Amino acid sequence: MSQMQARTMAFAGILQALAQVQYIARHGDSDTDAMAASFNTIMVTNPEQPEDVYADKDQLRVGYKWILNQLGDGESKDVEMTRYLVGLLALERKLSRSNAALGMLSERINQIHRQLNHFAITDEQVIANLASIYSDIISNLGPKLQITGNPNVLQRPLVQQKIRALLLAAMRSAVLWRQLGGKRRHLVFARKAIVDTAKKNLTL
């Protein structure tokens, strides 16, 4: 797998998780398989190769489609998704510069590993713990991401926890994207190459 392919895969992982955030914030319900795929990426902390992070490649198709939507030549850009993406990448930069936050993150993810001996990754207790990792470590690094949606839906504690857990999953992919050399300027100057790579992955 080339670096461009790996980087585009990680970027699809970010958008796949953020798309679920947007959907849950509006509708309240969620796709358990899609959520599990995103949550599982958090648990792969020492991959031998980038593709090891994404065990469920089918779920990444949503992310690749969002790449075409957001970076392609069409007029259908989603401003809300762009705002989430920009905010998340800004938080990731802060995370990458904080050894203390990275250390705490690693420790807390190890605790979830132990919990998975007894619970499924989409169990409400696990989701609550993933959400608290985001709240305790990521959220405090910079300006909080303002999630918009249905106010009645957003009041539900479980919805809030799912959103935070999915933001943690999006952060996992953002960390990988940067480790693979991803930079915000690529989204402008390497846009065509990213879109072409996403298209190829959708036709496989």
From Swiss-Prot:
Pfam families membership: DUF489
Primary location class: cytoplasm
Bilayer topology: Peripheral membrane protein
InterPro entries hit by this protein: HflD (IPR007451), HflD-like_sf (IPR035932)
The keyword Cell inner membrane appears for this protein: yes
Subcellular location: Cytoplasm; Cell inner membrane
Example of a GO cellular component annotation carried by this entry: plasma membrane
Keywords noted in UniProt: Cell inner membrane, Cell membrane, Cytoplasm, Membrane
Sequence similarity: Belongs to the HflD family.
Annotated HAMAP family: HflD_protein
NCBIfam families per UniProt: PRK00218.1-2 (NF001246), PRK00218.1-4 (NF001248)
Protein name (record): High frequency lysogenization protein HflD homolog
Species annotation: Shewanella amazonensis (strain ATCC BAA-1098 / SB2B)
Lineage: Bacteria, Pseudomonadati, Pseudomonadota, Gammaproteobacteria, Alteromonadales
Gene responsible for this protein: hflD
